[in-house]
């Protein structure tokens, strides 16, 4: 007898892009094995949206009375249904993919022997941007829609999460991976790795093989969200150094390693949390000018006003393929590319969907994730920036030192040479906060402009010097920094940056800072006592960053500087009057960022 197929119910919030992913998967998987259900809706045919069978209310009710539906539901003033004959397809071994509602999950789970929920998600700012682009709802309506809380997943349901926060091609690739990996989920009620998961829940350490088994079952959708939540919660409480190494090594088994014909391949990672601090766009050209290979892949912003990829995208193409990266390294010795298209991790899709909403302290888990991806990307040497300060991920110096030691120890376990530097994260680095404004600072440093932010220049030179010292011909980091300084001062780094931009694909219309501006001034005479990086980033995001690359904050003062009443503290840039008004509202006496820059009397 042929084994039953799996029923995939696709759910997710408005703006997640479910229809687009289903259409893309249909083009990829639409064959004898996968069937994509056509919904029956009491909506006129030809209406915008998915292809559906349109019926009148009376006909829908008649079909429902005749038992022609597998399941029905109400939404947006309409009635939706999936036909009963889909069950017959499952019985022949076909897999069925249907766009559905969270409200019918429990009912379908009881009816179908092999049932998987595919939960399509995206960060709230991405959802808001997509909904607003439809032009059917106002700004307040958009935010209310995004803020809606989804009901919890019923117990015992197999759920696979797909993060659709990037290009359509990548989203479709993730979605089709979820369908392929989840096809057998319902047939494995007891994953082979369950005993390892139970051991971790009891606080026992696991080895490399155990972690590999758990991850493989998690990717295949054989664990419920509740089981994975319990596992990750236990892992954040008890994950010793040897386990982090074991976890990192296990993760490398899920991605083929990229091989480079280079003795030294450099990479860099920052734990983030500091506004500005766009040193990568300076460090990479210096290292390239020296001659080391540095295929740098970087992320987009999640909660900050800009990621490295967001900033680089204001001047060059960043959605590079593996072939593009090899070409850039061959021609320019480096690249600064977006990592979403290059080292996407199905493991992270599954785990981040749990750790982020719960706010789990996953730093040790993150070390394994970060370094495993560096290893599979072909890096031999990695430098890590670990800022600490009141608004960063690490508030205490001791915690930062411990994490630095862990990075270096795990690096050894993966055969990597890792140098982790603990840095001051108590204040922003540079003046610009937001993609275009940060790139303006970068250009000033590369051009040795007299107005270039010295803190940005000095931090970039320190990291570039440490990287150059990876070369065995360089005796020390101090010598490396002298070499880096010379490369910057003589213009070699600027020339290398231009080569990288040209090789990646120069943007014909570089993004400029937003034309809508508002200056925040000192309320009284005194000294600048503190700059709250979290609030500064919040204002920049309210102004539109990084969605609007020209939006952000231009800091016009520094900590310790004496200011007069009415003297400018910072300038808000936005690309629209509405975004500017939203950001300015945050700075008022009752606003969330009223103390972004604190001025104390002398």
UniProtKB/Swiss-Prot annotation:
<dbReference type="GO" id="GO:0006206">
    <property type="term" value="P:pyrimidine nucleobase metabolic process"/>
</dbReference>
<dbReference type="GO" id="GO:0006213">
    <property type="term" value="P:pyrimidine nucleoside metabolic process"/>
</dbReference>
<comment type="similarity">
    <text>In the C-terminal section; belongs to the thymidine/pyrimidine-nucleoside phosphorylase family. Type 2 subfamily.</text>
</comment>
<comment type="function">
    <text>Catalyzes the phosphorylation of ribose 1,5-bisphosphate to 5-phospho-D-ribosyl alpha-1-diphosphate (PRPP).</text>
</comment>
<dbReference type="InterPro" id="IPR027417">
    <property type="entry name" value="P-loop_NTPase"/>
</dbReference>
<dbReference type="InterPro" id="IPR036566">
    <property type="entry name" value="PYNP-like_C_sf"/>
</dbReference>
<dbReference type="Pfam" id="PF07831">
    <property type="entry name" value="PYNP_C"/>
</dbReference>
<keyword id="KW-0067">ATP-binding</keyword>
<dbReference type="GO" id="GO:0004645">
    <property type="term" value="F:1,4-alpha-oligoglucan phosphorylase activity"/>
</dbReference>
<dbReference type="Pfam" id="PF00591">
    <property type="entry name" value="Glycos_transf_3"/>
</dbReference>
<dbReference type="InterPro" id="IPR017872">
    <property type="entry name" value="Pyrmidine_PPase_CS"/>
</dbReference>
<keyword id="KW-0547">Nucleotide-binding</keyword>
<comment type="pathway">
    <text>Metabolic intermediate biosynthesis; 5-phospho-alpha-D-ribose 1-diphosphate biosynthesis; 5-phospho-alpha-D-ribose 1-diphosphate from D-ribose 5-phosphate (route II): step 3/3.</text>
</comment>
<feature type="region of interest" description="Ribose 1,5-bisphosphokinase">
    <location>
        <begin position="1"/>
        <end position="187"/>
    </location>
</feature>
<keyword id="KW-0019">Alkylphosphonate uptake</keyword>
<comment type="similarity">
    <text>In the N-terminal section; belongs to the ribose 1,5-bisphosphokinase family.</text>
</comment>
<dbReference type="GO" id="GO:0033863">
    <property type="term" value="F:ribose 1,5-bisphosphate phosphokinase activity"/>
</dbReference>
<feature type="region of interest" description="Thymidinephosphorylase">
    <location>
        <begin position="188"/>
        <end position="602"/>
    </location>
</feature>
<protein>
    <recommendedName>
        <fullName>Bifunctional ribose 1,5-bisphosphokinase-thymidine phosphorylase</fullName>
        <ecNumber>2.7.4.23</ecNumber>
        <ecNumber>2.4.2.4</ecNumber>
    </recommendedName>
</protein>
<dbReference type="InterPro" id="IPR000053">
    <property type="entry name" value="Thymidine/pyrmidine_PPase"/>
</dbReference>
<keyword id="KW-0511">Multifunctional enzyme</keyword>
<dbReference type="InterPro" id="IPR000312">
    <property type="entry name" value="Glycosyl_Trfase_fam3"/>
</dbReference>
<dbReference type="GO" id="GO:0005829">
    <property type="term" value="C:cytosol"/>
</dbReference>
<dbReference type="InterPro" id="IPR035902">
    <property type="entry name" value="Nuc_phospho_transferase"/>
</dbReference>
<dbReference type="InterPro" id="IPR028579">
    <property type="entry name" value="Thym_Pase_Put"/>
</dbReference>
<keyword id="KW-0328">Glycosyltransferase</keyword>
<dbReference type="GO" id="GO:0009032">
    <property type="term" value="F:thymidine phosphorylase activity"/>
</dbReference>
<dbReference type="GO" id="GO:0015716">
    <property type="term" value="P:organic phosphonate transport"/>
</dbReference>
<dbReference type="InterPro" id="IPR012699">
    <property type="entry name" value="PhnN"/>
</dbReference>
<keyword id="KW-0808">Transferase</keyword>
<dbReference type="GO" id="GO:0019634">
    <property type="term" value="P:organic phosphonate metabolic process"/>
</dbReference>
<dbReference type="InterPro" id="IPR013102">
    <property type="entry name" value="PYNP_C"/>
</dbReference>
<dbReference type="GO" id="GO:0005524">
    <property type="term" value="F:ATP binding"/>
</dbReference>
<dbReference type="GO" id="GO:0006015">
    <property type="term" value="P:5-phosphoribose 1-diphosphate biosynthetic process"/>
</dbReference>
<dbReference type="InterPro" id="IPR036320">
    <property type="entry name" value="Glycosyl_Trfase_fam3_N_dom_sf"/>
</dbReference>
């Amino acid at each position: 007898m042929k084994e039953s197929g799996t029923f995939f119910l696709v759910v997710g919030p408005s703006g997640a892009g479910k229809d687009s992913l289903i259409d893309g998967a249909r083009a990829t998987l639409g064959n004898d094995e996968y069937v994509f259900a056509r919904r029956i809706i009491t909506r006129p045919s030809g209406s915008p949206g998915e292809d559906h069978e349109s019926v009148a209310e009376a006909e829908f009710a008649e079909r429902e009375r005749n038992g022609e539906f597998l399941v029905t539901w109400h939404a947006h003033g309409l009635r939706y249904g999936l036909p009963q004959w889909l069950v017959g397809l499952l019985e022949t071994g076909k897999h069925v993919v249907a766009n559905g509602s969270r409200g019918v999950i429990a009912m379908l789970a009881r009816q179908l022997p092999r049932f998987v929920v595919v939960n399509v998600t995206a960060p709230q700012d991405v959802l808001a941007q997509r909904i607003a682009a439809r032009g059917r709802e106002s700004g307040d309506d958009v935010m209310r829609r995004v803020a809606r809380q989804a009901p919890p997943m019923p117990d015992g349901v197999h759920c696979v999460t797909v993060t659709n926060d990037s290009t359509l091609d990548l989203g479709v690739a993730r979605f089709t991976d979820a369908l392929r990996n989840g096809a057998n989920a319902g047939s494995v009620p007891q994953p082979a790795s369950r005993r390892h998961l139970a051991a971790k829940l009891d606080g026992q350490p696991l080895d490399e093989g155990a972690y590999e088994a758990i991850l493989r079952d998690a990717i295949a959708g054989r664990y419920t969200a509740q089981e994975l939540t319990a596992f990750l919660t236990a892992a954040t409480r008890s994950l010793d150094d040897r386990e982090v190494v074991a976890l990192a090594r296990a993760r490398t088994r899920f991605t083929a390693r990229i091989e480079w014909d280079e003795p030294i391949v450099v990479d860099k990672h920052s734990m983030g949390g500091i506004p500005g601090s766009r040193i990568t766009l300076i460090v990479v050209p210096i290292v390239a000018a020296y001659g080391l290979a540095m295929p740098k892949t970087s992320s987009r912003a999640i909660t900050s006003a800009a990621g490295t990829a967001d900033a680089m995208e204001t001047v060059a193409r960043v959605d590079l393929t593996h072939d593009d990266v090899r070409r850039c390294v061959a021609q320019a010795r480096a690249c600064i590319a977006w990592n979403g298209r290059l080292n996407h991790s199905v493991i992270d899709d599954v785990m981040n969907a749990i750790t982020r909403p719960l706010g789990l302290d996953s730093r040790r888990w993150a070390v394994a994730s970060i370094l495993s991806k560096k290893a599979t990307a072909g890096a031999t040497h990695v430098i890590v920036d670990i800022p600490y300060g009141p608004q960063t991920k690490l508030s205490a110096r001791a915690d930062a030192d411990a994490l630095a030691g862990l990075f270096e120890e795990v690096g050894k376990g993966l055969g990597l040479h890792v140098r982790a530097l603990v840095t001051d994260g108590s204040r922003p680095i540079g003046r610009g906060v937001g993609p275009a404004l940060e790139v303006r600072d970068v250009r000033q440093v590369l051009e040795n402009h007299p107005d270039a932010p010295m803190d940005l220049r000095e931090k970039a030179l320190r990291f570039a010097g440490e990287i150059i010292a990876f070369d065995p011909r360089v005796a020390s980091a101090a010598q490396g920094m002298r070499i880096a300084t010379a490369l910057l001062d003589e213009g070699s780094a600027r020339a290398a940056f231009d080569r990288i931009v040209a090789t990646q694909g120069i943007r014909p219309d570089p993004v400029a800072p937003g034309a809508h501006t508002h200056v925040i001034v000192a309320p009284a005479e005194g000294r600048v006592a503190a700059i709250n990086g979290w609030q500064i980033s919040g204002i920049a995001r309210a102004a539109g960053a990084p969605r609007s690359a020209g939006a952000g904050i231009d800091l016009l003062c520094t900590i310790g500087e004496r200011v007069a009443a009415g003297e400018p503290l910072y300038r808000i840039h936005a690309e629209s009057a509405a975004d500017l008004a939203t950001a300015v509202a945050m700075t008022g006496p009752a606003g969330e960022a009223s103390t972004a820059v604190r001025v104390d009397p002398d």
